């Protein structure tokens, strides 16, 4: 073999080895990955972090995927609260991190405090050692029975959240003492990765919704496919808007990007409402007059909070939903509603007078689109236009509820708006012909005139359906009108 051919062969072998190494991905230490020898692989970065929880340093090491790395939230430290390192070589996160030590001017410990500081850790270490020995022996006995780890018990051994606290406690603590934008990211990730999925409860254009369990509590897990990353990121961003939390808006818990090496799942964890969507509820149930008013008032309350701007250092921007429909509203145990599915929502910055519209090709549901959206005359530079479109959609939802209201034993069967005018899956052209050209609206049955509550609801619907968006009611006006009706009907909403 000539020297030239030998050199070419060596170069080829080197390139093959380099390609194989790149294909294998970056290997990192992962403290949560005991099933894979505490190792994970990623195309992003290795991640190590330490945070202060109940006065103790809690360390976590894992992989950060490319979407998480691009989001620029995992590689930033917070003074005296968290210290985070991201690196890009194999096992580079196998390092020891510590938070900054207290200042020299801190008061010295007395003899009693010093005794406690020394004694308590020694006792805890002894207990931990005994528990570790016992756990190892017990694991050897039970491993043959099942390979499925009880992640809810594992959380008690390694967790970034306080033992014995419920999700409501954690969310209340974060809302009361933090920025009001939800749980810390590390806590969200810990919760999401220790949820046990139970059964699938729904499917949509985004993916699937599962019923899950976390430490004995029910949660809902909305699982997006990787191709819907924009929808997942946008919805998580909107839900974590400061001061958004409200009893009539779906309670957000956590968001996480779960990558098992072959495919990626994008999780959105929220409160679980076993009665399902308003669409499902109305298909199954007939409602009383008081029940109708109670449902309608809770929807108006949630939408009014969403539309309202709260001014201040911990303020909230005005938000428009853009996809209000009965399938995007959930019914709680107390028979009130919570508005959900904020993936298409827009935010308004009143200071800069700008509208934050998501970069998402999907639009709202055609059947519920306002006339100005159907005929493309909506002024997208004015935020009020989006709020007015929401009001039109709410009027259609109220029509669905009112049809299921029993008055004198008479009740209509459940139907979608415009069920008798367009096909089951109408196009924009078909909806535009009915709503804009023919100026038709859902029919209000004559028997509604015999009931004051239904007469009021019918008037609200008509004032929500005006072709001129500026003439429609505001969410706050709808809320006040139905509140007065609620007092008359003694619905105790």
From Swiss-Prot:
> What if the gene is knocked out?
Acvr1c mutant embryos develop normally, with none of the known NODAL-related phenotypes found in these mice, suggesting that Acvr1c is not an obligatory component of the NODAL signaling pathway, at least during early development. Acvr1c deleted mice however develop age-dependent metabolic syndromes, including progressive hyperinsulinemia, reduced insulin sensitivity, liver steatosis, impaired glucose tolerance and pancreatic island enlargement.
EC primary class? transferase
Topology term for the membrane: Single-pass type I membrane protein
Residues annotated as transmembrane = 114-134
Q: Which residues form the GS domain?
A: 165-194
What InterPro entries does this protein's entry cite? Activin_recp, GS_dom, Kinase-like_dom_sf, Prot_kinase_dom, Protein_kinase_ATP_BS, Ser-Thr/Tyr_kinase_cat_dom, Ser/Thr_kinase_AS, Snake_toxin-like_sf
Induction field: Upon oxidized low-density lipoprotein stimulation in macrophages.
First and last residue of the signal peptide: 1-25
List the record's Gene Ontology CC terms alphabetically.
activin receptor complex; cell surface; plasma membrane
Gene Ontology biological process terms from the UniProt entry = apoptotic nuclear changes; apoptotic signaling pathway; cell differentiation; insulin secretion; lipid storage; negative regulation of chorionic trophoblast cell proliferation; negative regulation of insulin secretion; negative regulation of trophoblast cell migration
Cellular compartment(s): Cell membrane
Q: Which reaction does it catalyse?
A: L-threonyl-[receptor-protein] + ATP = O-phospho-L-threonyl-[receptor-protein] + ADP + H(+); L-seryl-[receptor-protein] + ATP = O-phospho-L-seryl-[receptor-protein] + ADP + H(+)
Q: What is its main location?
A: membrane
EC number, as in UniProt: 2.7.11.30
The active-site annotation reads 323 (proton acceptor)
What the entry lists under Pfam families is as follows:
Activin_recp, PK_Tyr_Ser-Thr, TGF_beta_GS
**Tissue specificity note:** Expressed in interdigital regions in developing limb buds.
Residues covered by the Protein kinase domain: 195-485
Q: Which GO terms describe its molecular function?
A: activin binding; activin receptor activity, type I; ATP binding; growth factor binding; metal ion binding; nodal binding
Alphabetical keyword list? Apoptosis, ATP-binding, Cell membrane, Kinase, Magnesium, Manganese, Membrane, Metal-binding, Nucleotide-binding, Receptor, Serine/threonine-protein kinase, Signal, Transferase, Transmembrane, Transmembrane helix
Q: Which CDD domains match?
A: STKc_TGFbR1_ACVR1b_ACVR1c (cd14143), TFP_LU_ECD_ALK7 (cd23540)
Which ranges make up the Cytoplasmic topological domains here?
A: 135-493
Q: How does it assemble?
A: Binds the type 2 receptor protein ACVR2A.
Question: What PANTHER family does UniProt report for this protein, alphabetically?
Answer: ACTIVIN RECEPTOR TYPE-1C (PTHR23255:SF58), TRANSFORMING GROWTH FACTOR-BETA RECEPTOR TYPE I AND II (PTHR23255)
Q: What does this protein do?
A: Serine/threonine protein kinase which forms a receptor complex on ligand binding. The receptor complex consists of 2 type II and 2 type I transmembrane serine/threonine kinases. Type II receptors phosphorylate and activate type I receptors which autophosphorylate, then bind and activate SMAD transcriptional regulators, SMAD2 and SMAD3. Receptor for activin AB, activin B, activin E and NODAL.
Q: Could you tell me what this protein is called?
A: Activin receptor type-1C
> Could you tell me which species this protein originates from?
Mus musculus
- The gene name reads Acvr1c
